[in-house]
C-alpha cells in the first residue's frame, strides 16, 4: 500500500453520502477511489475523479483499492465484509458490525486469516459531548459514579418508507442507535454484569422498534441508554450522578448536522459544540453550585485517521475486533432481555 490509502465505498445512501464520503475525502492519507451505488448515472455527473460502479465486483477486483467501507443496509454488512476480505481488502463496516455474533465472528476470523484490518464505524466515540463526559468521569470530578443516563431522543411521529424503519432484518432503532449508545457506555465503564432492556414499537404504523430503554448493571452503578421517536421535549443528552456531584449536558454533537448541511470536515467551526455541560454540586446546607465545563472538540476524522494508521501498520484499529464482538453480543443479549422481560446476566 502507498502512503495514500485508496478507499472504495459500497453504498451511497445516508451513511455513505453524508458521513463516509466527506470524511474519507478530508482525512489526510486517504483518497476516495471508487463508489458502488445504484445511483451510478447521477454519481458519474457529480464525481469526475472517482470510479463509480453499479455493483461490487469491479471494485473488489481492482488492485488499486486498498480498503473497502461498507455503508449498505445492515443485512448486507457481514456478507460484503467477507467478500471484501476474501479479495484482500482492509474493511471498515458501518455500525452495526453484523446482525449476529455468529456473523461477526465469521468476519473477524476472515480478517485474521487474510491478515487484513477490520473495524466498525463507532464514530460517536468522537462526539464532543461524549469526549467531554469522558474527561469529567476520568478526572474523578463526580467522585464515585452511581448513575449515567444517555438519551438520544427524536420527534419523528411519521413512519417513513425506508429500510431502517422496515421489518427487514437489521431494521429498527435498537440496531440503529443502540450500537452507538452501548459502545459509549462500554468505553466509560467496561463490561457490565447484566442488562435489562425494553424494546418497543410505539408509533402508529411502525413496522420495527422505534423505542428502547436499557439498563446496564455494574456493581454500585447503573448506566441507562434510552432512545425514543415520540419525544418533543428531550431529556439532557447526558446526566451523570456521583458522590461529589452531577454532570448535565443538553444539546447534541453538531457534526452530523454540519455534514448534512454540507460543511466540510475540518472547516472553521467544525466539531465545536456551543452548549456547555454543567457540573452541579450541593453543600451540607443544601446550597447548589453550578459551573460550566469547557467542551472537548469533536472530530470524526480522528476515527478515519486511526483506521488509516492501522492499515499502514503504525497504529491500532479505532475499534478492535474484541470490542466489535463484545458490542454485538450486548445487542443480542439486550434483545433477549426485551423478548423475555427479564434481566439477563452477562459472563
Residue ranges and their predicted role:
Residues 1-47:
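N-terminal Rossmann-like dinucleotide-binding module
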Residues 1-4, 67-69, 265-266, 292-294, ...:
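C-terminal helix-rich "cap/oligomerization" subdomain common to oxidoreductases
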Residues 50-110:
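Beta-loop-alpha module in the N-terminal Rossmann-like domain of NAD(P)-dependent dehydrogenases
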Residues 76, 96, 119-126:
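Rossmann-like NAD(P)(H) cofactor-binding subdomain of soluble oxidoreductases
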Residues 106-123, 144-148:
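Rossmann-fold dehydrogenase core element
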Residues 124-205, 341:
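Predominantly a Rossmann-like dinucleotide-binding segment in NAD(P)-dependent oxidoreductases
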Residues 183-266, 294, 301-315:
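Contiguous beta-strand/loop segments that form the cofactor/metal-binding neighborhood of enzyme cores
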Amino acid at each position: 500500500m502507498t502512503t495514500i490509502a485508496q478507499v472504495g465505498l459500497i453504498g451511497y445512501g445516508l451513511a455513505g453520502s453524508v458521513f463516509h464520503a466527506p470524511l474519507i475525502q478530508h482525512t489526510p492519507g486517504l483518497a476516495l477511489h471508487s463508489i458502488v451505488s445504484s445511483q451510478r448515472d447521477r454519481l458519474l455527473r457529480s464525481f469526475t475523479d472517482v470510479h463509480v460502479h453499479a455493483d461490487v465486483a469491479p471494485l473488489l477486483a481492482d488492485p488499486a483499492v486498498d480498503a473497502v467501507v461498507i455503508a449498505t443496509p445492515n443485512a448486507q454488512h457481514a456478507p460484503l465484509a467477507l467478500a471484501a476480505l476474501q479479495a484482500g481488502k482492509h474493511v471498515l463496516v458501518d455500525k452495526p458490525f453484523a446482525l449476529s455474533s455468529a456473523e461477526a465472528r465469521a468476519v473477524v476470523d476472515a480478517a485474521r486469516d487474510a491478515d487484513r484490518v477490520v473495524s466498525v464505524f463507532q464514530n460517536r466515540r468522537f462526539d464532543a459531548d461524549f469526549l467531554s463526559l469522558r474527561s469529567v468521569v476520568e478526572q474523578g470530578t463526580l467522585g464515585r459514579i452511581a448513575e449515567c443516563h444517555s438519551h438520544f431522543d427524536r420527534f419523528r411521529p411519521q413512519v417513513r418508507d425506508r429500510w431502517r424503519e422496515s421489518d427487514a432484518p437489521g431494521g429498527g432503532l435498537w440496531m440503529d442507535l443502540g450500537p452507538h449508545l452501548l459502545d459509549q457506555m462500554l468505553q466509560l465503564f467496561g463490561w457490565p454484569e447484566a442488562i435489562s432492556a425494553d424494546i418497543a414499537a410505539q408509533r402508529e404504523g411502525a413496522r420495527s422498534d422505534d423505542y428502547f430503554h436499557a439498563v446496564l448493571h455494574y456493581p454500585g452503578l447503573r448506566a441507562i441508554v434510552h432512545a425514543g421517536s415520540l419525544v418533543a421535549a428531550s431529556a439532557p443528552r447526558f446526566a451523570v450522578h456521583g458522590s461529589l456531584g452531577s454532570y448535565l449536558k443538553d444539546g447534541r454533537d453538531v457534526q452530523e448536522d454540519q455534514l448534512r448541511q454540507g460543511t466540510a470536515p475540518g472547516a472553521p467551526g467544525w466539531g465545536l459544540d456551543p452548549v456547555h455541560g454543567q457540573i452541579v454540586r450541593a453543600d451540607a446546607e443544601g446550597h447548589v453550585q453550578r459551573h460550566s465545563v469547557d467542551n472537548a472538540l469533536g472530530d470524526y476524522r480522528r476515527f478515519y485517521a486511526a483506521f488509516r494508521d492501522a492499515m499502514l501498520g503504525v497504529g491500532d484499529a479505532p475499534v478492535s475486533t474484541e470490542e466489535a464482538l463484545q458490542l454485538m453480543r450486548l445487542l443480542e443479549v439486550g434483545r433477549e432481555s426485551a423478548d423475555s422481560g427479564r434481566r439477563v446476566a452477562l459472563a
